[in-house]
Amino acid sequence: MINFKKMIPLFSANYQKLQCFLLVLLSMFTIKIGVIPAWNSVNSDFPNYYISARLLTEGADFKNVYDDDWFNAKIRENGIEQQGKFSPFPPATAFVMLPLTPFSPLTAKRIWTVVNIVLLGANVWLLQKITGWQLISSANFLLLSGIGLINNFRFGQLYLLLLFVILLSYRCVTLRRQTAAGGLLGLGAAVKYVPVVYLAGFAINRNWRTPFAGMLAIFGVTAIEIIVFGSDVYRYFFAEVLLPHLDGRLSSQDTYAIAFQSWNTFFRHVFVADVASNPAPLIDWAAGYRIGKLIVTAAVAGLTGFAMWRLHRTNHPSRLALDLAIIGIAAMLLLPATATYHFLLLAFPVALLLSHLRDESQFSARFLILGSYAAIGFVTLIPFTRWKYSGWEILLAFPRLWLMTVLFGAAIWTIRNDRRDES
């Protein structure tokens, strides 16, 4: 694997003091804006995870769990004064916080914050093992995920846990424990969907034990869901929650919300009129929404397929890692609705990309990849979601989407021009 220190001067031994300064600066920022607020408040998605687990331990009827009004009433009954909902989570999400249900909401949040800190350290260690980077470089790399990491702490989210599952699964593969890797990805996919794309990546590389074990894990969790929650709840989830979610439609949330930073939201703003949310689209042509999504999806899929074909045609020594990298980045680019903490998951594919490409002469492309990754982490410090846009100004409303597009393009370009891919 390429030495990360040679790729970016910041990570050279000559810049050790600068690395230490960056580590202290990013750590202090994360603690002040993320960890301390997490310790002192119960907000955003944590109540949704916690209350769903409490309902499970209390034997509540889960048939109403996707009724936002009913779920909000349960949140208030537990002394939490905020709006919440269980949608769009799969039923299995209720299992995650079961160990914390004996505690009060604030105590449970504090315990989960400590767990997240431990998970951050574990992810740094796994990243170092996978990439061969120094520990301080791995730590800085994860801290550069910025607001995504901070909001994972603040909101009591699960994405450090999911990143841990993904990194550990890849580590298992490198240790030739493919079945364990698949089982981990399957368990992760039962709660959050992204790990499914990595199961597909292993299947493309004919690493059959990993996707087979992953699918068994998914089917096993699904069977448990049906037994515990009932088939009606699962059918409702599939038809009324999952399918609308894949189209960027989430209950009690505006489908035009700029905060989603997705192609779905962008094309809605450009093409689809709405009296309240989008009275004057750039081009009033409702069919353009579907056509635009189809074109982008086909382009991303085509370029991803081309990059993977090239890796396999030239028998690239790191084709599995680079396949997973490009699939992961493509999946993040096409997500129908995103939040800051989702982009913690970018750490895995971007780290694979940077550490496994062989041509050390492509400094500018590598710098662009790392720069895009860091910019995605901090771009939401700009309050672009609060501004009003009209006409062509709507193009300025989606900076994270454009940064993701740049990252994807740089990844494709770098793989295409990797001069040491024929070995």
What is each stretch, according to the model?
Residues 1-11, 414-423:
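Short, intrinsically disordered terminal tails adjacent to the first/last structured region
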Residues 104, 192-195, 349:
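Hydrophobic transmembrane alpha-helices
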Residues 339-354, 399:
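Hydrophobic/aromatic-rich transmembrane helices and adjacent perimembrane loops
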Residues 179-203, 327-334:
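Membrane-interface alpha helices of multi-pass inner-membrane proteins
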Residues 28, 352-423:
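Aromatic-enriched
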Residues 122-126, 164-175, 201-206, 210, ...:
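Transmembrane alpha-helices and membrane-interface helical segments
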Residues 2-180, 205-327, 332-333, 339-340:
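Primarily membrane-embedded glycan-assembly and transfer machineries that use lipid-linked glycans
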Residues 159-162, 182-185, 232-241, 363-370, ...:
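A cytosolic-side transmembrane-helix exit/cap motif
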